């Protein structure tokens, strides 16, 4: 019996040692995982962007074996912070992708799908239905609100739409303005609805989302013109990023399903639902050429001439 007891104690001790070694090995494995950062362009504000894309960052960490850190970045600071090497992966709107591709040879990973046009979207110029305005040429001397200047479908696409219709916004319009603060696209749509401006540059996706959420009725507006469809938000990677990791991240994005979840603050969260997206699609750099042509006509980065 004494021999059996000694054997049992020895076995238990050995098992404890093995468990401890396994735990230490696991800890070391986690500690030794590579660490990288993803810069996310702030959409409406930092808080909203954090809530939307923290689960996405966690998902990419789980799928690639890299500890990715979420980094919120102001649109106007994005290129400067990327150039400094603060982050190697990017999530931004499509004009920032074009700028970073032109200046820093950014690698295209995948394009975000959201709304009825999937990985593409468009800009529109809207007026109230009862405004009496039925075509772009009737905006002469009128007030119009645009989105931020680096908003592809809130500024660039609509400005270009006017130019292609023979209208110089600088001399043709009465005045134009950009709302202050967050949620600029929503504010523009409301400004048109409540008569604060005569017309607005509204992303078609915002009209779709606000209508679906019951905030507006599209029947209250007339779309005077719509731009061609252009790519929506885009994931990219710095040109010196390890190729195998680039492919891992691309595959993880393209494989993302509505049922995929991660744990955030002790709660299981659906990644796509949290990010307000419908998945990702693999576009080519050539698909971004319409943005390049718009930017050249509008005299915008990365092609502006002073």
Functional labels for PLM-detected ranges:
Residues 31-98:
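Extracytoplasmic small-molecule ligand-binding "clamshell" domains
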Residues 36-39, 44-58, 237, 241-306:
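An extracytoplasmic/periplasmic, membrane-proximal ligand-sensing/linker region
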Residues 41-42, 122-133, 229-244:
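A bilobed periplasmic-binding-protein/Venus flytrap-type ligand-binding module shared by bacterial periplasmic
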Residues 70-80, 169-190, 229:
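Short helix-initiation/N-cap motifs at beta->coil->alpha
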Residues 94-104, 158, 163-164, 191-219:
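A ligand-binding cleft/hinge motif common to bilobed small-molecule-binding domains
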Residues 106-118, 172-176, 211-229:
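Short beta-strand->loop
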